[in-house]
Amino acid sequence: MKKISARQLTTAAAIAALYTVLSLASSFIPPVGGVFQFRVSEALTILPYFTPAAIPGLFIGCLLSNLITGALPYDLVFGSLATLIGAIGTFALRKLGENTSRTLPGGMPLGAWLAPLPPIAANTIIMPFVIAKISEMPESIPLFAFSVFVGEIVCCGGLGLLLAALKKHPQLFGHE
């Protein structure tokens, strides 16, 4: 088993804290049209592409956010697992970025452009069933899937890619 450095542990803790703070701040943003919710903290789901410390950081941050906001057990468990699955998928795309000289607009490698897809997919697949279970509205799963997808595209895709563009400033992420 690989030993975890103090730097990795500190990075994971900082990401967890930032995810939690951003999630709590996002709870004050009213849902657009009553359906779409934008959890700004989801922009951080791009971070496993840059550091493996983000995987536990995001998972713990999501778990803490859900605990603090009083999420129901289904959301607490499956929402946190969706974040973990997305983080692992994003980290897996790191290899795609390392093994190709192909860069796309903004000078970012292909893997960085694809990095938002795992959390978008994980949340779009898992969360509609959680919302349907909690709301007791199973017939609304397609609507819930669409609303989660839109929120994830904006936060993971849009904001996450803006965050990824900061990779040109390695002092922000360090080197791992």
PLM feature spans:
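Hydrophobic transmembrane alpha-helices
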Residues: 1-56
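Membrane-embedded alpha-helical hairpins and interfacial helices in multi-pass inner-membrane proteins
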Residues: 24-35, 43, 63-176
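Extracytosolic (periplasmic/ER-lumenal) interhelical loops and adjacent juxtamembrane/interface segments
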Residues: 58-62
